[in-house]
């Protein structure tokens, strides 16, 4: 297995769709040149209960969310997480979850570049 020289981490952010725009508009501050965003259905420990509901749900109710996936150098993760937490925080149920996992390597298939080279802006030729 090929391993990247620089340690990389994957940050997966699950949140409301309305909060994703702020994340994407400001990601470049952290040198992020790419991300993956997809729609998801899910719920947390509240089982999909909304704050305006008087009683907690007894069964799972899946809510519409978006997942933002970013890979960046591990040394930059703490600053990025501070930004993400401040961007998402409302203090209400459903602000989201963040998962951080190590990434062994990243490979740009077209060029064979690996590690951070695979994540940086490349040439178009």
PLM regions: where:
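Positively charged, small/polar-rich N-terminal and surface patches that mediate targeting and assembly
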Residues: 1-125
């Amino acid at each position: 297995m090929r391993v990247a020289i620089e340690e990389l981490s994957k940050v997966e952010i699950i949140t409301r769709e309305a909060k994703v725009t702020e994340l994407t508009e400001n990601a470049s501050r952290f040198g992020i040149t790419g991300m993956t965003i997809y729609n998801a259905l899910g719920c947390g420990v509240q089982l999909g209960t909304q704050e305006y509901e008087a009683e907690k749900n007894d069964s799972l109710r899946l809510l519409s969310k978006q997942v933002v996936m970013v890979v960046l150098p591990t040394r930059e993760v703490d600053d990025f997480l501070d930004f993400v937490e401040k961007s998402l925080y409302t203090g209400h149920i459903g602000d989201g979850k963040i998962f951080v996992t190590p990434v062994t390597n990243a490979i740009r298939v077209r060029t064979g570049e690996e590690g951070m080279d695979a994540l940086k802006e490349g040439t178009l030729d």
